[in-house]
Amino acid sequence: MLIPCAAAALTLGSSMMAFAATGWLQEDEIWHYYDRNGDEVTSSWKKSGNDWFWLDEDGEMAVSQLVEDNDNYYYVDESGVMVRNQWRELENDDPQDDDEPDTVWYYFGADGKAYKAKDSGRVNFKTIVRADGATKKYAFDEEGKMLYGWIDEQGERQTGDDAWQTGLYYLGGPDDGAMRSHQWERLDAVDDDQTNDEFQDWYWFYFNANGKKAADTKKTINGRKYYFEEYGNARFSWYATSSNASVATPSFYSPIQDSWMSVGWFKTVPGENTDPAGYSDGEERWYYAEKDGDVVKSRIKKINGSYYAFDEYGKMLEGLYKLEVSDKDILSCTEIESENDLPEDGDTEEVYYFGGNSKAGAMKTGTTTLDIDGERYTYNFRKSGDERGQGYNGIEDGAIYEKGKRLEADKDEKLKKVEWDGETYLVNTSGKIQKNKKNAKDADDRYYCTDSKGIVTYEGMEKKSEK
């Protein structure tokens, strides 16, 4: 801390010129003062030139010491001159706590009086220009000692483990004392109620223009959003704005390093309270938060030209899923990891695929080949409209699709009958509908005939005659 402490002090040798029996008199190298009656002056100030000097109870001029006079405190330097408009670091001869430093700071104003607390019962800050030209605010106790660390509304220092909870202002260390305002501070905190494994015995705090810590509020600072708890610590990790939060409750995430509400894309481990199963997996997942910090959940959302889906906990979906969707809201969500997970005819879910391109998790449209239980399948997903991303149901590009999967014959079948919309179609190993076929033969030597739509008109072990 830069504290102005250089004083231009006149020495007695230059300011006291010569003294008669009345006035200043040096005896045994100690200065005394005698009034016009010849009486020695004690416990009083006397002026010489532009400077004031203190005569103690023995009539000796005081040097290098703190002087108490009429409930005010002054300091005289090594020449006995009253110090004015200066900081002084003095021995702490009356420590109140074991953790107090050996020295304390005082500031002496233009009248030489040490700044000290008023009797109003509220903290009183003094504005002082430091040696570096910066203007800062400081507070002092009733004896003029500069306060530091956490203090409350009354200007009392808070020194226990709960100081960060009971304190309202923060004034830095013992050699600092400047009130924090418009400023962040990362401060040590003992919090036995904190169960998050990320907690490292400190919190971020923000101090407003009036020096008071932000508490129990959401605040935008330099374009970033933060949520401050009851005692002013900026929240970190996962949290919801309601004590009885459910998966439907808006949730937020703030990294511990800076504690701002994440906005846009971020990657982290799911929260222990917001997503217990995901937390147990311990795998980092992608999330997306709106401008207000609210994490997108149970929704398909367009982001930077691509569509993404998020489950009920806000995790970005990656892979093949069956979803029940209503106006971009996801009502149900199940990952398809095996053929047993595929939706059945009549199910309300539709199949979507997220990934498979340069943007991880982006909704896939058009055709793609996917592996399910070691088998390769061709899927086709709608490219536009309200059903964008859904797997096709029906005939598209000369093939039949069911929940996006192309229906086709196995290689060892060559041809296969497919039931669709009340009709029986014939498809090959590429899923192509076989139209206008005459006696097409499958791997079992069974013959088929189809019409112009590919609907089977004949099936048998014998060729159909040309009659």
Task: Describe these PLM feature segments.
Residues 1-467:
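Extracellular adhesion/carbohydrate-binding repeat motifs centered on closely spaced tryptophans
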